[in-house]
């Protein structure tokens, strides 16, 4: 069996690697579901998948914060010229 190690110890996923991490998670799931792995390898692969999921979650949270900040900055710069989005939809300009 080939053992894979996570070379990214920073806990974050670079933008270009997000899709690669998701693909690796899917591959890990397939290997585990195949039933052909030894139990120790299953645990190692599962631990890797959890680590990748956490990295992807951190990446998505960071991007959401960036988007929120950009929207806030845009709204502050343009004042009420841009309709603000609420949970119900678009609020009319005041």
Curated annotation (Swiss-Prot):
UniProt keyword 4Fe-4S present: no
- A Gene Ontology biological process term: DNA catabolic process
- Cross-referenced InterPro entries, in alphabetical order? Exonuc_VII_S, Exonuc_VII_ssu_sf
E.C. designation(s):
3.1.11.6
Q: What Pfam families is this protein classified in? A: Exonuc_VII_S
Q: Where in the cell is it found?
A: Cytoplasm
SUPFAM superfamilies hit by this protein? XseB-like (SSF116842)
Subunit relationships = Heterooligomer composed of large and small subunits.
Q: What does this protein do?
A: Bidirectionally degrades single-stranded DNA into large acid-insoluble oligonucleotides, which are then degraded further into small acid-soluble oligonucleotides.
Recorded hits in PANTHER family, A to Z, give:
EXODEOXYRIBONUCLEASE 7 SMALL SUBUNIT
- UniProt-recorded name of the protein: Exodeoxyribonuclease 7 small subunit
- What is the organism field in this record? Trichormus variabilis (strain ATCC 29413 / PCC 7937) (Anabaena variabilis)
Its gene?
Answer: xseB
